[in-house]
Each structure stands twice: as C-alpha cells, then as structure tokens.
Amino acid sequence: MRIGLLSDTHITAGRPVLPPKLIDGLRACDLILHAGDVCDVTGLAAVKAIGPEVAAVTGNMDRGALVDMLPEFHVAETPAGAVLVLHALPHIPGGARAAIDRLLGGHGRPLAVVHGHTHCPDVQ
C-alpha cells in the first residue's frame, strides 16, 4: 500500500493549488492522509480531486463547514498496522505518547503517527 502524506496545504479559493509534480506523485498512491490545515472546503475538494481515497483531519487554520466535516484525529488501518493522523501533537502533562494513548482509548499503539502544524518535515 502506497500512502501520500500532506499537511498544512492552506488551499483556499483564489490561492494556488498543489504543484503538478506533487499531484502526479499522489495519484500513484492508494491513500492520501492530510494532517490538517486544508483551510476550507475548496482545498479539501482539490485534494479529493486527485483521485485516491483521502482521509483528512481538522487543523487550527481550518474554517467554516470544514471544521464540522473533519474529525480531530483519524486512525487509518493499513496492511502494516494502524496510522494515527492528527494536526498537532498535544502539549499536555505526560507528553505526546500519553496523549496518543488517551486518544486511542486503549486500542493499542499505532505503527506510526502523522502530524502537521510545525511546517517542518521530520521523521522520528
């Protein structure tokens, strides 16, 4: 399974959409995970128009109807295991790991956690 990861695309009416080379790469995916800050329904429609299944979560810059349409977090089930998608890792007592455990409600640890918000790519 090939998964495309997006976050913080900030696509709104009248603003540029994703670069053509990125769109071509995403079309080759089986699933696109968007970790928030799509910004409005226009942006979500642009991502969904790429083709593969899209699972998106809400971010701090999302507005209007989009906030009601998207969940705070999503667990994508893949053949390799569960992938947790959320916008920002919580800054709460106990740290991110404890917060993730609480979000998942004891359903086991995910294979990976995908988040956005920082605008800095990072793999840990």
Regions found by a protein language model. Give the residues of each.
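Conserved catalytic scaffold of divalent metal-dependent phosphoesterases
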Residues: 3-17, 21-34, 38-124
